[in-house]
Amino acid sequence: MLSRRSAFPLHASVLVALLAASSAPTPLYALYQAEWHFSAMTVTVVFSAYALALLGALLTAGTLSDHLGRRPVLFGALLAEAVAMAAFATAQGVAALIAARVVQGLATGVATSAAGAALLDFEDPGRPGRATLANGITPVAGMAAGVLASTALVQYAPAPTRTVYLLLLTVFAAQAAAVLLTTETAHPRSGAWRSLRPGIAVAPASRPAMKLLAPGVVAAWALGGFYSSLGPSLARLIAPHASRATGGLVFFTLTAAAGLAVLAARTLPARTASFAGTALLIPGALLTLSAPHPHSLLALFAGTVLAGTGFGAVSQGALRLLLSPAAPDERAGTLAAYYVLSYLAMSIPAVLAGLLTNLYGLQRAVSLYAVTVIVLTLAGLARTARQPSSV
């Protein structure tokens, strides 16, 4: 059996791998488009198939590990993730790509809440706050690692649409085997079938923070969804003759900046981190909005850095405010509720952006998207400023 000390980094690596797999297709969309001849709208549908499937899993199975145990739930989800990677590697068209994204989303939704709760369970009592920090940084670190590896393979590998998925399949299979060697930390209890009824289980003590943080979280993840789905297309619009890797580097820049912000924000009060991060989304969105007009990649990447920094700070502050007051048996549900809100914010606006791109062109869609994010951000800042600091 793995020791408690070894189990913590294992579950952190699971979250990194899950989010690496979620971002791996981003640099490949241009290759898929060139081979299968589909539109920007189809790109956002493929992207959102993953996010909506993940939402369905969180709404139904987000608390399943509280009832059945972390270990069996996580083992099954990782095996399903490996199946999804095999489906990606063998996909021959858009329908197969969407199907693989759906399987991946379901598996990730189940695994994310279970692994995140396990991190809290395995936290060293002598190092409080480490699990919340890990829950904040592993998703963005995973997305950064996934998009960077995929971008490198696009540039240098002979079969980039297969290689990255076969590597991830191997990782998930190894992690599934390692999870079986960990100690079970949840105490299985009855009610597993009832827990599958769609619903959101936010800890009562965390509900005021959820209401306060919602606009900022929605704005941050909506901006992240844009960069993930249409970031490469925007880079090609601005610099049509740039390297194929440029589109992937846009999303890598976002996630790398977010990861650094999570680390920096851990020393700030949680509410301060969330407020400052929300404020940074405004200049990030404005620079992104302005980038197509002078055809400036510098403006795009500067906006991406600001947006990523805001994204990371918002995520770090929000997770600390939400998870700190939750009881141990409320953690998985509260974490799942946070991800439900986040992925709704990430997927629905991205689909609308794809529709707007088809109707009016990418440049106008970028403008409308940026304005929407700014309005949400201002609403979040106003709500935070009005609430007492004790909330």
Give the positions of each predicted feature.
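C-terminal transmembrane helical hairpin of 12-TM major facilitator-type secondary transporters
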Residues: 272-316
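Cytoplasmic helix-loop-helix junction between adjacent transmembrane helices
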Residues: 100-139
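Helix-breaking motifs and short loop linkers at transmembrane-helix boundaries and internal kinks
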Residues: 37, 69, 90-95, 158, ...
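Helix-loop-helix hairpin linking two adjacent transmembrane segments in secondary transporters
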Residues: 130-180
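A late C-terminal transmembrane helix in Major Facilitator Superfamily
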Residues: 311-313, 318-370, 380
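Conserved MFS/SLC helix-loop-helix module at the cytosolic interface between two early adjacent transmembrane helices
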Residues: 55-94
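Transmembrane alpha-helices of Major Facilitator/SLC transporters
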Residues: 247-270, 284
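Structural signature of the two symmetry-related core transmembrane helices
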Residues: 72-87, 273-288, 367
